[in-house]
Amino acid sequence: MKHVAGFAVIALLAATLGAEDRPVALAPVEIVAAAPAAGWVAIAPSDLMVMDLAPDAKGKPRRVVIQLLPPPFSQGWIGNVRKLAAAHWWDGLAVVRVHDNYVTQWGDPDGEDKVKAKALPEGLVTVPQNAYSAPAVGARLIRDPSRGLLYGKGLIADQDAYAITQFWRGWPLGRSADIGPAQRNWPVHCYGMVGVGRDYPPNTGSGAELYTVIGHAPRQLDRNIALVGRIIEGMEHMSSLPRGHGELGFYDLAKGDERVPIVAVRLAAEVKDLPAYEYLSTESRSFAAYADARANRRDPFYLRPAGGADICNIPVPVRRIKP
């Protein structure tokens, strides 16, 4: 019995030492922090738009920085958005809707009133419905043989409920199942994405009414409404606003709601001392490891890996570039 007990103690010590010797898996945030400088891509200032809301109740500024989508996606709407910002059209307008777990929307509170509506700048285009998607852009193959990676050729989900999904140049995309020239890509409605409000089809929206997703990703909107970008800084100013008490979360002044004024919306070229930003390249090995860690948490808090992740649960890391 003494020998049996001795063997048991030795086995226990061996198991304990083995557990201590095993490397601790990194959490996603640790993988991002350890990513080499070469793995980050600078965001062009020309792709940034800045919205300043009125200060909060304590007088603190509320700035929201939006990164606009690159070609070939949504360029008709983005062209309109650039013209609206250049004309300072949103200045003095407001956040008009905050629908819990859905969207925060801003624009002209009198936009539905033909008499009171603010005149739009000249040169805005009407964008066709087929522009909700674009010819497929593809993605470079990345594999990490040391991990059970579900990230190859940019693809993230082979069992996504809505579409094949992938990342491309820092953006989450859906992809059609077509082969060859018929294949299409489109941006998807993840948290923080910015879209174009519209009326019933065939209306596609001008870009004067914008919204951002503040809740669970409403992927049913993909290819039904245009997306023009995403919020990369200041998202807390949009998600924490009081919810509207009117229909669909619109602010109802008769019910005591107060709209949040917009002080200014500017393209980055007009904003003094705007920080520079960069994103973790979705073509990098660091992002591959990060995506795998989001899908399969192995860091000490977790008991078992989930075995997968929705594309919107793998947000692309964005940070300020240190001066």
Regions found by a protein language model. Name each.
Residues 1-4:
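Positively charged n-region of N-terminal signal peptides that target proteins for export
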Residues 6-15:
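Bacterial N-terminal signal peptides
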Residues 17-323:
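Cyclophilin-like peptidyl-prolyl cis-trans isomerases
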